[in-house]
Amino acid sequence: MARVKRGVIARKRHKKILKLAKGYYGARSRVFRVAKQAVIKAGQYAYRDRRQKKRQFRALWIARINAGARNNGLSYSRLIAGLKKASIEIDRKVLADLAVNEKAAFAAIVEKAKATLA
């Protein structure tokens, strides 16, 4: 059986990694050995941050809802408790959007929560 040298396979592997590293600074986009490490690290960051993104957005929504609720004389925790009691099922993403863009609608929701708590 004929001996197969790895030229074609190695070139393909290198091109794939260097393509993924396109736009990286300095040797990270040109030297295979460095580029491979950079691509692996980038993948680790991407994996981790896809999970962190969900936590960070939830925290942002809560901060916005809290600010809007306090402008209407209620704390975040009291607002959420009031909404649960009133059986109003609006998720935090929508509540945050209302608090920022539709202040009148958000105020009406807060008033319903207040009425349920009283």
Swiss-Prot record:
Pfam families attached to this UniProt entry: Ribosomal_L20
CDD domains, alphabetized: Ribosomal_L20
One term under GO cellular component: ribosome
Origin superkingdom: Bacteria
InterPro entries: Ribosomal_bL20 (IPR005813), RIBOSOMAL_L20_CS (IPR049946), Ribosomal_protein_bL20_C (IPR035566)
GO biological process: ribosomal large subunit assembly; translation
Molecular functions (GO terms): rRNA binding; structural constituent of ribosome
Signal peptide: none
Residue ranges of coiled coil: none
Record key words, sorted: Ribonucleoprotein, Ribosomal protein, RNA-binding, rRNA-binding
Entry keyword annotation includes rRNA-binding: yes
The keyword Transit peptide is assigned to this record: no
Protein task: Binds directly to 23S ribosomal RNA and is necessary for the in vitro assembly process of the 50S ribosomal subunit. It is not involved in the protein synthesizing functions of that subunit.
Family of this protein: Belongs to the bacterial ribosomal protein bL20 family.
Protein name per UniProt: Large ribosomal subunit protein bL20
Organism this protein belongs to: Pseudomonas fluorescens (strain ATCC BAA-477 / NRRL B-23932 / Pf-5)
